[in-house]
Amino acid sequence: MNKLITIERHFVEEQKLNPDATGELTDLLYDVAFAAKLVRREVVRAGLVDILGMAGTTNVQGEEVKKLDLFANDKIINAIGQHGRFALMGSEENEGTIIPPKNESGKYVLLFDPLDGSSNIDVNVSVGTIFSIYRLTGDDPSKADINDCLQKGSQQVAAGYVIYGSSVVMVYTTGHGVHGFTYDPTIGEFLLSHENITTPKQGKYYSINEGSRKQFNDSTVNYINYLKEEDAETGRPYSTRYIGSLVADFHRNLLTGGVFVYPATKQHRNGKLRLMYEANPLAFICEQAGGRATNGSERILDIDPSELHQRTPLYIGSEEDVIIAEEFEQGKR
């Protein structure tokens, strides 16, 4: 029988690898895991309670908000904010920063997308939570402000995501590899199921919404055409796999190899995905697993942000596939 390792125990064991660790980051990650359990409880009951459908409001991005978006957002803020470990938080659903009720001793910043892919929830397609953790830039939590949120992705101390699908899986990194945990509802715990995840150097799948093809720039069209061409030497053609839920598409490609593409378009010249709580955390995870993430011209983790809800194009996944995407976007092919 395989040894069962809970997520809490794994956090503690990882902490021992760092002689300077105080245990604070371990507590933060466990808070996130606890919040994920609360969201999971409602996601699996979504068809039985009145949290499907639209909430009748729009978020700061101008997107229609689902009832479950609001529920997940509130649960995460309340579950994590009450412990005083975060001085500041930022969410896709809130225009400005969020000051937790007990932030006097907080030394960290949490940025998150409470329910990525929520447009799929009504039809029972996988959705997820994405999160990113930074240290405060100063020592005084009472002086924390938006600038503490606007750090480069390379400054992240932890990042992760939770997928609510046929099973519930939490994947995270603290910069020392990538680990995945599957939720066991019979004991109410996340158990280690994917240790030291590494992504293939080259994949065989590409994920993109080709329904927007007419909006793509020529460089993106040429890249997609390249992936479809037959060439046994380079393993082409690739197959399309696109769910429409960023975290689910990314997770599949992370495990099996492939590239996820959400490019700049004629309509959205700066891209559409959010840098701070979608692209950055996934880029951190991807690089830790041996992959690559870029906006087409610059490494995602090197982008200097100017606003909380900043958007970016995203090419992320297997290293060789992303390098070729960069070459097309930069006119080298």
UniProtKB/Swiss-Prot annotation:
Subunit structure: Homotetramer.
One of the record's GO molecular function terms: magnesium ion binding
Organism, as annotated: Chlorobium phaeobacteroides (strain BS1)
Family: Belongs to the FBPase class 1 family.
Residues that hold substrate according to the record: 116-119, 209, 242, 272
Names of required cofactors: Mg(2+)
Compartments where located: Cytoplasm
Binding residues annotated for Mg(2+) 1, in chain numbering: 92, 113, 115
Record-level GO BP terms: fructose 1,6-bisphosphate metabolic process; fructose 6-phosphate metabolic process; fructose metabolic process; gluconeogenesis; reductive pentose-phosphate cycle; sucrose biosynthetic process
Name recorded for this polypeptide: Fructose-1,6-bisphosphatase class 1
Enzyme Commission number(s): 3.1.3.11
Residues binding Mg(2+) 2, per UniProt: 113, 116, 278
Associated pathway: Carbohydrate biosynthesis; Calvin cycle
Keywords of the record: Calvin cycle, Carbohydrate metabolism, Cytoplasm, Hydrolase, Magnesium, Metal-binding
Annotated Gene Ontology cellular component terms: cytosol
Pfam families xrefs: FBPase, FBPase_C
HAMAP family in the cross-refs: FBPase_class1
Enzyme class: hydrolase
Catalytic activity, reaction form: beta-D-fructose 1,6-bisphosphate + H2O = beta-D-fructose 6-phosphate + phosphate
Cofactor note: Binds 2 magnesium ions per subunit.
